[in-house]
A protein has these predicted regions:
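The short loop immediately C-terminal to the conserved phospho-acceptor aspartate in CheY-like receiver
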Residues: 64-69
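Acidic, metal-coordinating helix/loop segments flanking the phosphotransfer/catalytic sites
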Residues: 40-58
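Alpha4 helix (beta4-alpha4-beta5 surface) of REC/receiver domains from two-component response regulators
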Residues: 72, 76, 97-114, 118
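Non-catalytic signal-transmission and effector/linker regions of two-component phosphorelay proteins
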Residues: 1-11, 19-21, 121-138
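Two-component/phosphorelay signaling modules centered on CheY-like receiver
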Residues: 19-39
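Negatively charged, flexible loop motifs adjacent to catalytic sites
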Residues: 20, 43, 96-100
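Short amphipathic alpha-helix used as the core "switch/output" element in two-component signaling
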Residues: 70-86
Length: 138
């Protein structure tokens, strides 16, 4: 078994239309070792552009995004990212925590699904799991 190669740093992009949540994530990430926040986006279009330029290891993604800028939501973005970047880790962080959203996101390839209100504290643990994950040697 070999560790995933994150070049010693996990590179993260956040996608959320709430400035408060984005700031909470930034604050949390700033306290973690080996995490580099590459940038944040509020809608799917700007997120795709940022992600294509930066190629993060991890995307922290909300379902509801800025509807004024795009007709794509976080699930649409999840599908697009999963098809283009199958190795990228995607953490869904949303207030839409009903089972049907969780099932859809997991079915479309999300690695984690967290409720913003109840599970925010789980983000560091998920990032740590990603950093220390092992995969079979090829």
């Amino acid at each position: 078994m070999s560790k995933l190669n994150f070049s010693k740093r996990i590179k993260v992009v956040t996608v959320d239309d709430s400035p408060i949540i984005t700031q909470r994530i930034k604050s949390m990430l700033s306290e973690m070792e080996n995490i580099e926040l590459l940038g944040s986006a509020t809608n799917a279009v700007s997120a795709l552009s940022l992600i294509h330029k930066q190629i993060p290891n991890v995307v922290i993604l909300d379902i509801n995004l800025d509807e004024n800028s795009s007709q794509f939501n976080g699930i649409d973005l999840l599908i697009a990212l999963r098809s283009r970047y199958p190795q990228m880790k995607i953490i869904m962080l949303t207030n839409l925590s009903a089972p049907q959203y969780r099932m859809r996101c997991i079915a479309f390839g999300a690695n984690y699904f967290f409720d913003k209100s109840n599970d925010f504290y789980k983000l560091p643990e998920a990032l740590n799991e990603i950093a220390t994950a092992t995969v079979p040697s090829v």
